Each structure stands twice: as C-alpha cells, then as structure tokens.
Amino acid sequence: MATQRKIIHIDMDCFYAAIEMRENPALIGKPVAVGGSVEGRGVLTTCNYEARKFGLHSAMPTAQALKRCPNLILVPVNMPLYKAVSEQIHQIFRRYTDIVEPLSLDEAYLDVTDCRQCSGSATWIAQEIRDAIWNELHLTASAGIAPLKFLAKIVSDQNKPNGQFVISPENMTAFIYDLPLKKIPGVGKVTNEKLAQLGLHTCGDIQHSDKAFIYKTFGKFGQRLWEFSHAIDNRKIEANRPRKSLAVENTLPTDIWHLAEAEQIVDELFKKLVFRLQRNWGERSLQEFKKLAIKLKFGDFTQTTLERTTDGLSRERFIELLQQVWQRTNRRSVRLIGLSVHYPTEKVKKQLNLWE
C-alpha cells in the first residue's frame, strides 16, 4: 500500500500589506492597501483586513477603492522588499523539507511526507512553521493540511487569518462528499452555474453521476472534476520548478460569435494579466515579455492556441493575435478566451538582443 502523502499549503495573510504594516507600525489598525496611484489609473495589489471591511479587494481600481474608503492609506508596491521577505519564509520551509512548490511570493505547497520532525505530524509541522514565521518575521500565515494537493489549498482558507485546518485521511472521504463543487479549483461562476442547472452541487453529487456524462459535458475539465470528487489527485509537489508562463482566461456566461465582442473581453483580460505580472514582476518592463499566446475554446469544447514572439507585451499585440486566431472559428461560437505570456529568461534576452 502506498504511503499516505502529507501536504501543507501555506498562504500568507494579506502579505504585501502585512509587510508594510510591519515596516511602519503607525499603519496598524488603519485601512491600508498596496497598489498604484489614481493618477496612473492604478489598481490595488492587496489590502489589509481593515480595508476589506469596506468591500475593498485586490485588482479593484484605486479610484473606486478611495470612493468606498476615503481614509484608505495607499502604499506603493515595493517588490524588492516583498521578494526578500518571501525568500526568508522559504528558508523556514526548508528547515522541514526541500520539496517546496511556490505558487507566488506569498503561497506555496510543501510535501512533508518523509519529514521526521514533530514526530512526523504534518499538523505540528504546519504550526511550527507558522510560529517561526511570526516569531522571526512578525507576519502571520494560514495553512491547510491534507493528503491531497487540491484539498490542502482549499482548507488553507478555512481558518484565515492566522489559522490552520486539517483534513485527516480518516475524515477525507466524508469531507469531500459534502464539499461544494464551487470550492474546487477551476470551477468559476459560469461552470458552477452549469453544474447547478444539472443538479450538481457537491462532490457527492458527482460521485452519484455517470462518469461518461461528466466527461462529455465538461470536456477535459470533466476528468479533473471527476477525479477530485473521488479523492484522486496524483499531482506531485514540484520542487524548485520555475514558472515559465502566466495565463488568464474567462469562461463566458454565454457563447459569443463576433470579433468585436471578443476584443472587449481581451481588453479586460489584458488588464488582469498586467495586474498579475506587476504583482510578481513589478520591477520588469512590459517590453521584456515578448512571447505571447491567445487561446480560444469553442462551443463544441475543442480549442486552438496561437503563439507569437513580439516586440513586447501590449494590448495591441493581443488584439492582433485575436484577429489572426479568429479565422479558425469556422462559424463556431466561442465559450472561453485566454491570454498567456512566457516569462523572460536571461538566455532568451541575450538571444533577442542579437536581433535588436
């Protein structure tokens, strides 16, 4: 019998804002957000819990945030500091395991299956890690502990902020059976509405459904939906895997048929893509991101992708890609549009310089 895995998902609490409050204690207890200025048509990168009481959230336009919360204290992004603190957190992780998969600066998966510290208890290990982060860095973290990767991520939100939640092998089956499908990664508003129309609300409902029907109705995602609902998640924690690209996509409430409609969606996706890039690559120019791609998924669930190396990241370049890939629709409706960009590397930069 295979060894039951022990997975921890660590998620820092309002990370950037928490660092700013640590650096300037006068901010504690006040609504604080990290983000761009109104003049620069900026958006919030994150905000603390005091600000969230006013309905503020990440990616909200700064101008809108200030209308909701006139006393909001806006702090500019300090990416070098956030990256330095993130590395300090990862040094704490590595005291317990080398199998660490970062998802962003403020969250990561840890595989502690073979860790012998804390008598091998993943629960105690997570608590020790969170204690160390607080004692050494004066920041709080939340954690989810489970035998499966997707479950660990889901339950890390369960006792936020500054808490943790455990799914043991013994209670995993019952927990998954009652788990709302909207909690599963990848189930957005549109997919959740479609599931609800079919009378599917929990993983238990999927368990009682026909496998072929789920696969046919939801395409490739149907396989993940079926497996997660049956407590199957064999994805490994990929240690030291550098992320090579970033993607954003939108499953549409209703299929579209016209290029003009698609261009409006690309506009919104481009803003979201730039926001996420600036969150993790704030010190890099958008012109350094040269390899772009666009994806269309059609009403029949087939999909196509077009990738190009360009002179840099811009809305105009994505619109050009959209106009080219739209020729492949062949009178089919479009149900999803996605944009992606490859991260620049030193090797790629040197190669490109030869042609500048």
From Swiss-Prot:
GO MF annotation terms: damaged DNA binding; DNA-directed DNA polymerase activity; magnesium ion binding
Phylogenetic placement of the source organism: Bacteria, Pseudomonadati, Pseudomonadota, Gammaproteobacteria, Pasteurellales
Enzyme Commission number(s) of this protein: 2.7.7.7
Subcellular locations according to the entry: Cytoplasm
Positions of the catalytic residues: 107
Protein name: DNA polymerase IV
GO cellular component, one term: cytosol
EC main group: transferase
Subunit relationships: Monomer.
Main subcellular localisation: cytoplasm
Binding residues annotated for Mg(2+), in chain numbering: 11, 106
Cofactor: Mg(2+)
Superkingdom of origin: Bacteria
Annotated gene: dinB
Cofactor mode of binding and number, as noted: Binds 2 magnesium ions per subunit.
Function per UniProt: Poorly processive, error-prone DNA polymerase involved in untargeted mutagenesis. Copies undamaged DNA at stalled replication forks, which arise in vivo from mismatched or misaligned primer ends. These misaligned primers can be extended by PolIV. Exhibits no 3'-5' exonuclease (proofreading) activity. May be involved in translesional synthesis, in conjunction with the beta clamp from PolIII.
Positions marked as site (Substrate discrimination): 16
Family statement drawn from the similarity comment of this UniProt entry: Belongs to the DNA polymerase type-Y family.
A Gene Ontology biological process term: error-prone translesion synthesis
Keyword terms, alphabetized: Cytoplasm, DNA damage, DNA repair, DNA replication, DNA-binding, DNA-directed DNA polymerase, Magnesium, Metal-binding, Mutator protein, Nucleotidyltransferase, Transferase
Reactions it catalyzes: DNA(n) + a 2'-deoxyribonucleoside 5'-triphosphate = DNA(n+1) + diphosphate
Sequence ranges assigned to domain UmuC in this UniProt record: 7-188
PROSITE patterns: UMUC
